[in-house]
Amino acid sequence: MSEDRQGRSTDTGKILYCSFCGKSQHEVRKLIAGPSVFICDECVELCNDIIREELEEKAQSARSSLPKPREILEVLDQYVIGQNRAKRTLAVAVYNHYKRIESRQKNDEVELAKSNILLVGPTGSGKTLLAETLARLLNVPFTMADATTLTEAGYVGEDVENIIQKLLQKCDYDVEKAQQGIVYIDEIDKISRKSENPSITRDVSGEGVQQALLKLIEGTVASVPPQGGRKHPQQEFLQVDTKNILFICGGAFAGLDKVIQARSTDVGSIGFGAKVKSAERKQEVGKVLAEVEPEDLIKFGLIPEFVGRLPVVATLEELDEPALIKILTEPKNAITKQFKKLFEMENVELEFRPDALSAIARKALKRKTGARGLRTIVESVLLDTMYDLPSQENVSKVVVDESVIEHKSEPYLIYQTPAAPEQKAAGAE
C-alpha cells in the first residue's frame, strides 16, 4: 500500500486514521502523512493554539516585570548624563505605553490612546542613546531609521514600510515580538515642508513623507515582504500591526528656538516702548526649546496631523563643558573607560589627566558636535600610540594631558625596566 503526502490511500478500500486523535480521513478535511504516522488538520490547529497560548503567557510574564518609571530613570542615569527632564518624560511615556498594551489585552472599556514621542535637541545631546538604552532595558526589538532617506511610495528612495521590515529583521521575523518593538526615526526635522503654504508641486521627501508616516505611527497593518524580498503582486506578505509599536522621533530642529522666541515676544511692542531681547536669553537655547508648543512645530514645517501623532514632546539641552567631562568619565560605557579597557588588553595602564578631559570637552564644543564628537577626538589623539603599542615592550603606562590633546606633544609612555621605571615622551630619542 502507498499514500500521498495528504494521507490519501492509493489503494482502494483502505481507510487512514489520524495517529493523534484517531479520526478517519472521512471525518477531517486533511490528513497529512509522515514517516509511518498521520496527523489531521484539526490536531495541527490544536498544536498551534497550545504554542500560541504559551507565547502569550511568556509575553505577559515579561510585561509583569515592566520596570517602573523611577527604575527606568535609574538605568538611563547610568548611560546618559544630564537631560533629567527629558529622561523623566521618556520614563513615564514608555511605562504608560506598555501599560496601555496590557490594558488592550484585558479588553478594558476605556481605550487608552497611543503616545508616541518627539525628542527635540541639538546634535550630540543624547537623543539616539536614550532610545537605544530604553530598548535594551525593556528587552524589545529596536531599529533606527533616517528620515532623510525616506520618500513617498513609488519614488526613488526608501518606502516608509521599510522601517517595519528592519524591525522584523532585528527579531528574526517574529511578528509578535516586532509588534511590541520600538522604532527611532532620526532627523525628523529634515522632512519639514519647504514652506508654510500648501504647495501645488509634490514634495516627495518632505511633506509627502510626513503624510506617509501618519498611518504607520498612529497604527495600521503594514504589508512587509518575507525575509526582505522585493514586493511583487504574486507574493505573500507578512502582516504587521503597528498600533502597539512605540515610535520615537528625534531631530535637532535648528532654528526652532527663533520660532518660539518670535511667538513669545509681543508682536505689538515696537518703537521706544518695545521690549528688547537680552543677549543672555538668546544664548539659552535649551530653556527656549523647553517652551515649545505644537504651533511652533507647525510653523517650523511639520504638518498639524503629524504633530498630533506625537503628543509627548521631550526637549534636550545643549551640553556644556562640565556635562561633556562627565560623559567622558561617568557612564557605564564611558569613552575613557572603553579606551582604558583596550589598553588593559595590552597590559598597559591608560591615564587621562583632568586638564586633558577639559581640553577634549572644549574641542567638542568648538566643533559643535556635542557628545558624538568626543570619541573622534580621543581616537585621533591615541591612534599612533595604539598602532605602535602592540610592537613595543616594557610599556607600563600611557599618560594623556592637555598638551597631547592640543597636538603639542605625543602621549607620554612610562617604561617598566628591571632597574627603574623610565619616563619619556613617545617618539623622543
Swiss-Prot record:
It comes from the Bacteria. ATP binds at P122, T123, G124, S125, G126, K127, T128, L129. Residues 6-59 form the ClpX-type ZB domain. One of its GO terms (biological process) is cell division. PROSITE patterns: CLPX_ZB. One of its GO terms (cellular component) is HslUV protease complex. The keyword Acyltransferase does not apply. InterPro entries: AAA+_ATPase, ATP-dep_Clp_protease_ClpX, ATPase_AAA_core, Clp_ATPase_C, Clp_protease_ATP-bd_su_ClpX, ClpX_bact, P-loop_NTPase, Znf_CppX_C4. SUPFAM superfamilies: Glucocorticoid receptor-like (DNA-binding domain), P-loop containing nucleoside triphosphate hydrolases. It holds the Pfam family zf-C4_ClpX. Keywords: ATP-binding, Chaperone, Metal-binding, Nucleotide-binding, Zinc. SMART domains: AAA, ClpB_D2-small, zf-C4_ClpX. Zn(2+) binds at C18, C21, C40, C43. GO terms for molecular function: ATP binding; ATP hydrolysis activity; ATP-dependent protein folding chaperone; protein dimerization activity; unfolded protein binding; zinc ion binding. Belongs to the ClpX chaperone family. PANTHER family: ATP-DEPENDENT CLP PROTEASE ATP-BINDING SUBUNIT CLPX-LIKE, MITOCHONDRIAL, ATP-DEPENDENT CLP PROTEASE ATP-BINDING SUBUNIT CLPX-LIKE, MITOCHONDRIAL-RELATED. ATP-dependent specificity component of the Clp protease. It directs the protease to specific substrates. Can perform chaperone functions in the absence of ClpP. Component of the ClpX-ClpP complex. Forms a hexameric ring that, in the presence of ATP, binds to fourteen ClpP subunits assembled into a disk-like structure with a central cavity, resembling the structure of eukaryotic proteasomes. NCBIfam families: clpX, PRK05342.1. This is ATP-dependent Clp protease ATP-binding subunit ClpX. The lineage of its organism: Bacteria, Pseudomonadati, Pseudomonadota, Gammaproteobacteria, Lysobacterales. The gene is clpX.
